[in-house]
A protein has these predicted regions:
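Short, compositionally biased
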Residues: 156-173
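General beta-strand structural signal in soluble alpha/beta enzymes
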Residues: 18, 32-35, 106-110, 124, ...
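Active-site-proximal betaalpha loop/short-helix elements
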Residues: 83-85, 173-232, 274
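Small-aliphatic-rich amphipathic alpha-helix that forms the alpha element of a beta-alpha
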Residues: 51-76, 93-101, 182-186, 190, ...
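Glycine-rich anion-binding loops of enzyme active sites
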Residues: 38, 72-159, 256
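Acidic, Ser/Thr/Pro-rich beta/coil linker or hinge segments at domain junctions
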Residues: 174-178, 247-275
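N-terminal glycine-rich phosphate/pyrophosphate-binding loops that anchor nucleotide-derived ligands
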Residues: 1-60, 64-67, 129, 143-144, ...
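Short hydrophobic/aromatic beta-strand micro-patches
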Residues: 125-127, 236-240
Length: 275
């Protein structure tokens, strides 16, 4: 079953109006909330990463969603299930990584239990005061699509790990992704119009497709290097063209939003009807 199908079943059963974006926006409380699991042999292998790197990435996958919403990272709770071979030094380094990967957010609690595999479940809270919060359903015809950073390094790093390599710039990009709080702040603190923003944890092309589908538009994009990669954790946003001169941060334009035309995503005139 695809992730979207599963999400739709959960939405139907819970009748929740908060499910759909990577963060739930609780407007009356001025916060966003998100949660991600980080599971050994699913999302990482202990032989490929240091305890610090495991903790760092476990935090950044959550903080990235907070930044994609436009909010400011504020708090984390950490649920940890650890096997018996995890020692005190491992835990110290793991939590040092979580703290560094929190980008200023404070760890305020959590839960600890035993288990057969290392399992980290983090809930992140961001504050929304003086910020305009994004939604993937807010891309509109006439908007331009912007992003920042180089794509494809994380996917390259994973392949190198599979080949037995342990150190390279690409491997570090995969294990210790650098987030973009400045990009998020440059948009959310200055924009007044609705806009759509996501991180590219599942790939740039995937994020573009999800924004277009949620907004019922077509995004026409350039086929830049790494567009079909994954886990780069850059941000991509669809914003009004008139807003570009207000952004005091490096970015580049990769596409434009059009009225829906048969497919949600068009990359160099190749239409993608599903992704």
């Amino acid at each position: 079953m695809k992730e979207l199908e599963l999400i739709n079943i959960i939405k139907e059963q819970t009748q929740s109006g908060y499910i759909g974006d990577d963060c739930a926006f609780l407007k009356d409380l001025n916060i966003v909330v998100t949660q991600d699991n980080f599971i050994e042999d699913v999302h990482f292998k202990r032989e490929w990463a240091t305890p610090y790197q495991i903790g760092y990435k476990a935090a950044t996958v959550n903080i990235s969603d907070v930044l994609a919403s436009g909010a400011k990272p504020a708090y984390l709770t950490v649920g940890l299930s650890a096997p018996n071979d995890i020692d005190n030094d491992f835990i110290k380094e793991l939590y040092r990584g979580i703290s560094d990967g929190a980008y200023g957010a404070k760890i305020i609690g959590g839960d600890i239990t035993g288990g057969n595999k290392l399992f980290i479940s983090i809930t992140a809270i961001g504050t929304t005061k003086d910020r305009k919060i994004s939604s993937r359903s807010h891309a509109k015809p006439g908007y331009v699509v912007i992003t920042h950073g180089k794509y494809g390094e994380s996917a390259k790093g994973l392949e190198e790990l599979k080949q037995g390599l342990r150190k390279s710039d690409s491997i570090r990009a995969h294990l210790e992704p650098k987030l973009e709080p400045e990009f998020s702040e440059a948009i959310s603190c200055n924009i007044r119009e609705d806009y759509a923003m996501m991180d590219t944890s599942d790939g740039l092309a995937d994020a573009l497709y999800k924004i277009a589908e949620a907004s019922n538009v077509t995004i026409k994009a350039k086929n830049i290097e790494g567009i079909f990669g994954f886990e780069d954790y850059h941000l991509v946003a669809a914003v009004p063209d008139s807003f570009l001169n207000k952004i005091k941060f490096n970015y580049y334009v990769i596409g434009e939003v059009k009225e829906f035309d048969c497919s949600y995503l068009n990359i160099n005139n190749i239409k993608y009807y599903d992704y």
